[in-house]
Amino acid sequence: MTDLDPVVLAERLIDCPSITPATGAVFDCLQAMLEPLGFAIHRFVAGEAPDGPVENLFAIRKGPEGARHFAFAGHLDVVPPGEGWTSGPFKAERRGELLYGRGAVDMKGSIAAMVAAVAEIPADAGTLSFIITGDEEGPARYGTVPLIDLIRQLGAEPDLCLVGEPTSVHRLGDMVKIGRRGSVNMWIACKGAQGHVAYPHLADNPIPRLVALLADLDALVLDGGTEWFQPSNLEITDLEVGNPATNVIPAEARARISIRFNDRHTGAELVARVEEIAHRHKGEVRAVISGESFITLPGAFSAMIADAVKAETGLDPELSTSGGTSDARFLRAVCPVVEFGLCNATMHKKDEAVAMEDLRVLQRIYRRIALSALS
């Protein structure tokens, strides 16, 4: 067993720029951390521009024959830093009690905490693995999905998987995610016939039809929520005509909507419902389902996480399904999956930062979770 400082590990990862889609140096850095701990490393690059190339890493340290297998999943890619940082986004900086840098909380910090945690777990405790992608913040086409394919080819499916997304809100340990709503985006087009505004009888203006279509969609009440999920919501996210002329009736009007939905629906059902309304207004729909809703019902796995959090923080975490999508939506097809990590207040913001003490507490929480999962 080795004693590693999660703050130092986080600094090393932050110092490797890894804007999504990520490849290269940041994976070299993680590999250099894991190999001395006895992990066998599998790395591969998938996809092509514009959504790739993407690097992925699966690291496994096998325990005794028949031992339980606990996996930690996460991502090394980060969103672009933007402007206005008070220090370099890809040069970790300690100021006061905080560690600054892009990825500090989302989610290089939690990866560092888990590496430090497993360094304290003996090899004979069971099988441990890391499922790490460079394609979570982007389209997520070439990341966790092909990683799952590799894991199945290796016959290395875990019994339980913890995703290290920053789930905490006000204090480390106040929230654990046991599920997520599904997500579907749709592009709607109403076509007409271009013409002069002074001769409307010679044209077909698609805008009134699109406006009426969107009004029908906006009036929908999808549900009132379920036991573990908030109500589904449909949002109009874009309107486009692309008509710079004041005297021209356009030939086409377009809109985009996004639906976040709970376990009362499937993506396909919602697409069909929108298509039915769109067809009444002579509209066409193209849809992309990003993921279905899922839940790991409260039970032994969530209890061991809650117990670990309570032991180290004194908090009783809320079990929640709020928030956006994550790669847990893919991993749930392999084994039970729960998400827990750092406070998310500064994720995707300038001057992203994590309390250094939170990294050390998270290391201890993760160690407790892993040992419980392997027992």
Curated annotation (Swiss-Prot):
Catalytic residues (positions): D77, E136 (proton acceptor)
Catalysed conversion reaction: N-succinyl-(2S,6S)-2,6-diaminopimelate + H2O = (2S,6S)-2,6-diaminopimelate + succinate
Residues engaged in binding Zn(2+) 1: H75, D106, E165
GO biological-process terms attached to the record: diaminopimelate biosynthetic process; L-arginine biosynthetic process; lysine biosynthetic process via diaminopimelate
Domain of life: Bacteria
Obligatory cofactor(s): Zn(2+); Co(2+)
Keyword line: Amino-acid biosynthesis, Cobalt, Diaminopimelate biosynthesis, Hydrolase, Lysine biosynthesis, Metal-binding, Zinc
Cofactor remark: Binds 2 Zn(2+) or Co(2+) ions per subunit.
EC number: 3.5.1.18
PROSITE patterns, sorted: ARGE_DAPE_CPG2_2 (PS00759)
Pathway annotation from the record: Amino-acid biosynthesis; L-lysine biosynthesis via DAP pathway; LL-2,6-diaminopimelate from (S)-tetrahydrodipicolinate (succinylase route): step 3/3
Binding site for Zn(2+) 2: D106, E137, H348
GO molecular function, one term: zinc ion binding
Enzyme class: hydrolase
InterPro entries (UniProt xref): ArgE/DapE_CS, Bact_exopeptidase_dim_dom, DapE_proteobac, Peptidase_M20, Peptidase_M20_dimer, Peptidase_M20A
Family statement drawn from the similarity comment of this UniProt entry: Belongs to the peptidase M20A family. DapE subfamily.
Oligomeric form and interacting partners: Homodimer.
Function: Catalyzes the hydrolysis of N-succinyl-L,L-diaminopimelic acid (SDAP), forming succinate and LL-2,6-diaminopimelate (DAP), an intermediate involved in the bacterial biosynthesis of lysine and meso-diaminopimelic acid, an essential component of bacterial cell walls.
Protein name: Succinyl-diaminopimelate desuccinylase
